[in-house]
Amino acid sequence: MKDAQLNTFCQRHQAVLINSASNSITVAVVDAPSHALLDALHFATQKQIDIVCWTRQQMENHRHKPDQAPSANAAKGGETAAQLLNQTLRSAMAKRASDIHLEPGASRYRIRLRIDGVLHILQDIAKETGLALTARLKVLGNLDIAEHRLPQDGQFTVDLMGDSISFRIATLPCKEGEKVVLRLLHQVEQTLDLDTLGMYGAQLTAFRQALQQPQGLVLVTGPTGSGKTVTLYSALQTRNTPGINLCSVEDPIEIPLDGINQTQIHPRAGLTFQNVLRALLRQDPDIIMVGEIRDGDTAEIAIKAAQTGHLVLSTLHTNSTSETLIRLQQMGVARWMISSALTLVVAQRLVRKLCPHCKQRLSDPVVLSPNLWPSALPRWQASGCQHCYHGFYGRTALFEVLTVTPTLRQLIASGASAQALEAHLQQTGTGTLFENGCRAVEQGMTSFEEILRVLGMPHER
């Protein structure tokens, strides 16, 4: 179809053809294109179709111009959106970002990158460019471009820097427009090895011993984004041999692994954690991994599996090892079941590592109460350099490991308070998260300010 015909065709659908190149066309619409327009355009031309969202005032201004022929200058918004998207994705990859946030404001859009768990501003862009970028992302993610009132989720893959990179897109209607978050699904090959997790001697020994048991429940706890998944998969890999039947139920399957029978739940189809767990017990499993214990039913099935000759690994959203014991009781699991099945609890957090190229030790130390840490801690500063951009490069995990001893089993079964459980942990555990964080500060791995950001200041004992 010729450009003149395309222009007339677009006008019938209250749209404007603003650019036509050899392999693409750019069409401007008010707010968002209709399904009828998109379907008709795909039928009329084989070229790539780029949509630019204009305000009603922009459309009126365009219609009153004496020359309305498609031009390269008029298509600047569409070209800018395409170029900006490519630049943003490249910046995210170069800076090791895990997420990209596109946030609408009253007059401008803000783009932020989450790097090592912290958001950093990349740039602000014009409102029109932000709208065009949002529309382009929704088309890439196969979302309903005309829907602005409801959240949407999708996924797309692009060729970037010589690799095929996948992104998960999620939109959310906000006061000033649609907020878009992209999650980079591209992951660098990661060695799933217990020795590389960051546990020190006593913690690693306790973890290995629990994983070699023929049965029992091992829980890894912490908030979202604390590294639980890598710890869990590393644990599975230590037992991944031809003589063992490893099964998992996950939402979603985050790291595909050879040798493990991985099942992803599908609640809409009736495939829930509970249903899959019951089915797995009829699959002659040796070790079962449950991606997350979300409710009492799942917890009870997992514990029963751990009591009947299976080693069960799972995660729970709690802040510490002692809190995990209380949370299971709050879920409705009987105390005797917890005390008989639970063998080990690991709590963890991720902290940013100081950049080795620009970190400096300052003269004034950090002095804490002796009840919290007995000696002065070095104070570190990293101002940022060409290697790290912000003073930190990468993250490492802090761990708190609690082995369930016979004494602790009695405390759980008798309904001991959180304070009593915490006191027992202080006497027999391998150190709290805060104590192990202070150890990392002593070693120059991270700063005390970073420990406070992630853990906060604990109460004195």
Predicted regions and their residues:
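A short, compositionally biased micro-patch
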Residues: 20-21, 44, 105, 213
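Core recognition of P-loop NTPase motor domains used across DNA-transaction enzymes
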Residues: 8-11, 15-18, 36, 40, ...
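Polyanionic, low-complexity intrinsically disordered segments
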Residues: 1-43, 152-161, 165-170
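Charged, low-hydrophobicity low-complexity segments
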Residues: 43, 50-90, 95
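Short glycine/Trp-rich loop-beta-loop segment that forms part of the substrate-binding cleft
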Residues: 26-61, 198-208
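Short alpha-helical interface patches
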Residues: 11-16, 21, 45-46, 51-68, ...
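Short, flexible helix-loop junctions that flank or precede catalytic/ligand sites
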Residues: 10, 78-91, 95-461
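Short, basic, glycine/proline-bearing loop/turn elements
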Residues: 23-25, 69-75, 192-193, 261-263
